[in-house]
């Protein structure tokens, strides 16, 4: 068997005796006929001669094994139940060709009908292979059902963009590639990283995808240095020099392109400058009437602004409606004048006092009449009169011009303190702590905001 296979391999392939012996030994080590067929087709191709050789090889190689197993099959047939015998008979009758059973009558057959010429046998084998492939395609299209494993979302396979890696986009990439080639020339084998992924884990090295001596597939991790398996250089020194020259040429081309872009930008900027310069020159040669009118308008605007700065009078009034609902924002108005700030501070204090009074209520409960009366002290009308006077004074101040120092406080509009002499009479017993505070001298200090404070 081995000798016959070796002779046929030498007829089909132009190889020596040793390689033919290796091919036959690997083919004889295959277990099934399908695996042997795939092996021979991948090695010899799918021509008519190879298909005939594959069929003869499978008959000689695997026919003896089936015939050796026939006694055990016959023993097992005796133990089969009658129902199984009936099924076997039905299948046996159905397995005969169409000319064997015709009109429910059994006919004899000649042995010559089963003798096939080698050319016709090759055609039939090729037809059988194509029909088998068609049937396998049809069976693949039929889905048996939904499995639990089908419900799991498939992982998206990461596709390496080889087109982007082939492009050289910048000078930094070119310098990096040249540096990598120079380093790979001087690196030792002990310092290199060995990777046996065969390009399945890492992308292939584009410069040298495999070793020409041993055929090892080289990935990016291993680089361009010598092969880690056979120690032979993957790229010769001449090829490395050619790569470096090509990379330098590409770098010079990119530099020229960058310089051209820079020159085009300068030309466009010069054109824009000339266009603006021409427009400015055109504006000079206007009608004298238009120039006089524009100069007069500018002079009037200048006089108005200078007058505003000289008088520094307040001509606008801001009505803050939000302050009616939030009294705490009255004193923090940055746009208010010092007089308005002082008045806002007094208003805020009064509003806070009113809010505190509303919280404190006195309830009078009459058990006899079964009534509850809320006793709340009403604010005196004097406070409203004082507020009205302060507002009138403020409107008068707003109509006048401000002083040169806008931070100076307007103290004349605030209520003055009143001294009650009855406290010092002998009829009233005043504590010593209060007397000390009354007799103490107060010093007036002005803070940064222009507000007076007593110390």
UniProtKB/Swiss-Prot annotation:
Annotated function: Probably functions as part of the RQC trigger (RQT) complex that activates the ribosome quality control (RQC) pathway, a pathway that degrades nascent peptide chains during problematic translation.
Name it.
Answer: RQC trigger complex subunit RQT4 homolog
Ordered alphabetically, the record's keywords are:
Cytoplasm, Phosphoprotein
**Chain intervals with Polar residues compositional bias:** 65-98, 119-130
InterPro entries for the chain: TRIP4-like (IPR039128), TRIP4/RQT4_C2HC5_Znf (IPR009349)
Q: Which GO terms describe its biological process?
A: positive regulation of DNA-templated transcription; rescue of stalled ribosome
The organism encoding this protein is Schizosaccharomyces pombe (strain 972 / ATCC 24843) (Fission yeast)
A Pfam family annotated for this UniProt entry: zf-C2HC5
Assembly and oligomerization: Component of the RQT (ribosome quality control trigger) complex.
- Which GO MF term does the entry hold, naming one? zinc ion binding
Q: Where in the cell is it found?
A: Cytoplasm, Cytosol
Modification type Phosphoserine: residues: 70, 380
Lineage per the UniProt record: Eukaryota, Fungi, Dikarya, Ascomycota, Taphrinomycotina
Where is this chain primarily localised?
cytoplasm
């Amino acid at each position: 068997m081995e000798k016959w296979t070796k002779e046929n391999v030498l007829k089909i392939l132009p190889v020596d005796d040793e390689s033919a012996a290796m091919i036959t030994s690997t083919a004889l080590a295959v277990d099934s006929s399908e695996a042997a067929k795939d092996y021979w087709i991948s090695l010899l191709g799918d021509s008519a001669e190879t298909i005939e050789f594959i069929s003869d090889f499978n008959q000689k190689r695997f026919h003896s094994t089936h015939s050796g197993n026939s006694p055990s099959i016959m023993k097992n047939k005796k133990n089969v139940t009658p129902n199984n015998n009936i099924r076997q008979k039905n299948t046996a009758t159905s397995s005969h060709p169409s000319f064997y059973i015709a009109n429910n009558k059994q006919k004899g057959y000649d042995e010559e009908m089963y003798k096939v010429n080698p050319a016709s046998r090759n055609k039939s084998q090729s037809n059988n292979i194509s029909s088998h492939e068609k049937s396998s395609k049809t069976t693949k299209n039929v889905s048996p059902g939904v499995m639990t494993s089908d419900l799991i979302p498939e992982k998206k396979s990461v596709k390496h963009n080889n087109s982007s890696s082939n492009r050289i986009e910048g000078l930094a990439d070119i310098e990096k590639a040249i540096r990598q080639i120079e380093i790979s020339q001087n690196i030792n084998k002990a310092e290199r990283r060995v990777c046996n992924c065969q390009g399945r884990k890492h992308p292939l090295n584009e410069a040298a995808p495999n070793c020409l001596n041993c055929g090892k597939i080289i990935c990016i991790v291993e680089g361009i240095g010598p092969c880690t398996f056979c120690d032979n250089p993957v790229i010769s020194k001449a090829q490395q020099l050619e790569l470096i020259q090509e990379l330098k040429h590409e770098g010079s081309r990119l530099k020229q392109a960058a310089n051209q872009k820079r020159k085009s930008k300068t030309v466009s900027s010069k054109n824009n400058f000339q266009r603006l310069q021409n427009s400015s020159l055109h504006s000079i040669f206007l009608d004298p009437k238009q120039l006089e009118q524009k100069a007069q308008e500018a002079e009037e605007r200048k006089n108005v602004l200078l007058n505003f700065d000289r008088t520094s009078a307040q001509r606008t009034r801001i009505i803050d409606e939000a302050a009616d609902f939030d009294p705490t924002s009255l004193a923090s108005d940055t746009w208010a004048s010092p007089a308005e700030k002082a008045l806002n501070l007094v208003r805020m204090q009064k509003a806070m006092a009113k809010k505190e009074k509303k919280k404190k209520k006195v309830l009078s409960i009459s058990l006899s009449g079964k009534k509850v009366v809320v006793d709340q002290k009403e604010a005196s009308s004097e406070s409203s009169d004082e507020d009205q006077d302060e507002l009138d004074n403020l409107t008068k101040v707003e109509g006048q011009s401000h002083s040169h120092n806008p931070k100076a406080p307007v103290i004349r509009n605030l209520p003055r303190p009143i001294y009650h002499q009855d406290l010092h009479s002998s009829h009233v017993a005043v504590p010593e702590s209060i007397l000390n505070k009354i007799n103490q001298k107060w010093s007036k200090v002005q803070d940064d905001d222009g507000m007076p404070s007593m110390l």
